[in-house]
From Swiss-Prot:
InterPro entries: RELL2, TNF_rcpt_RELT. The chain crosses the membrane at residues 15-35. The keyword Transmembrane helix applies. Residues 277-294 have a biased composition (Polar residues). Belongs to the RELT family. Residues 47-68, 135-164, 177-212, 247-302 are annotated as: Disordered. GO terms for biological process: positive regulation of cell-substrate adhesion; positive regulation of p38MAPK cascade. The gene is Rell2. The modification Phosphoserine is found at residue 52. Induces activation of MAPK14/p38 cascade, when overexpressed. Induces apoptosis, when overexpressed. GO terms for molecular function: collagen binding. It is found in: Cell membrane. This is RELT-like protein 2. One of its GO terms (cellular component) is extracellular matrix.
């Protein structure tokens, strides 16, 4: 039996190892590239040496000139910078160029000055005499950014005292305003005493100007009682009718009916001697003592 010689090695074993190493290095490079790509998307920086560091000026964000600009001003500027919105604004303003303020970006202004010719397609406004907004830029003077007027902000209102002020934050003290019917001490005034000028109800003034107590300051007049309807329509004097024509002719022959009519007329009419009772709301009582006088002479004869 022949034994294998120790100096001879199979040649295929070294070739396999070479292919395996190349494949491992290729996979490692591919994985590293993918890792750097993912980290770059997340905001990380991947560099191979210290000499290839980027400049600090490129990493810093661009500084905004208008740091104190409000949100509303930013929105207005974005709207005006749009070409379509600027053209619509120009058409709305019409010929009054002094009133309209169109803010132009610095990039468009420098490009138009350097090139000398408008770098846009000329738009033709159908049915309008307004020129193109891009062509009219060279004719206009450079516009200045208009800020908010601060004249009205510093004016203090009447009755206000500024206690603390930082920027737009301000603390003011407002004095309490008293009403027309209230004193400084908080007690309300009573203006119901008429022309007496706050005079007490139990004190009145005499002709000499000295106050006099014990009399009422306000005198109320009692309303006059309205005339009765029966008295207005049927005038009565001493229990008899003044006008004899009001008595029916058919009742003249019968003294009893005429007496009853006179008594009923006296009862319906107001009593001349009791005006105060009717005014005070008390019922009047009929006085029957005068019935004998109200009877005609014919009834007495019978």
């Amino acid at each position: 039996m022949s034994e294998p010689q120790p100096g001879l090695e199979p040649p295929q074993h070294g070739l396999y190892m070479l292919f395996l190493l190349v494949l491992v290095f290729f996979l490692m490079g591919l994985v590293g590239f993918m890792i750097c790509h993912v980290l770059k998307k997340k905001g990380y920086r991947c560099r191979t040496s210290r000499g290839s560091e980027p400049d600090d000026a490129q990493l810093q964000p661009p500084e905004d000139d208008d740091v104190n600009e409000d949100t509303v001003e930013r929105i207005v500027r974005c709207i005006i910078q749009n070409e379509a919105n600027a053209e619509a604004l120009k058409e709305m303003l019409g010929d009054s160029e002094g009133e309209g303020t169109v803010q132009l970006s610095s990039v468009d202004a420098t490009s138009s000055l350097q090139d000398g010719a408008p770098s846009h397609h000329h738009t033709v406004h159908l049915g309008s005499a307004a020129p193109c907004i891009h062509c009219s830029r060279s004719k206009r003077p450079p516009l200045v950014r208009q800020g908010r007027s601060k004249e009205g902000k510093g004016r203090p209102r009447p009755g206000e005292t500024t206690v603390f002020s930082v920027g737009r934050f301000r603390v003011t003290h407002i004095e309490k305003r008293y009403g027309l019917h209230e004193h400084r001490d908080g007690s309300p005034t009573d203006r119901s005493w008429g022309s007496g000028g706050g005079q007490e109800p139990g004190v009145s003034q005499v002709a000499g100007g000295q106050p006099r107590t014990g009399t009422a300051a306000i005198e109320r007049l009692l309303p006059e009682p309205p005339p009765s309807q029966a008295a207005a329509t049927h005038p009565v004097q001493n229990g008899r009718l003044k006008d004899a024509s009001l008595v029916p002719c058919t009742l003249e022959g019968t003294p009893g009916t005429s007496a009853e009519l006179n008594v009923g007329t006296r009862g319906t009419g107001p009593s001349p001697g009791l005006p105060s009772q009717e005014a005070n709301g008390q019922p009047t009582k009929l006085d029957t003592s005068g019935q004998q006088d109200s009877l005609p002479p014919e009834a007495g004869g019978m």
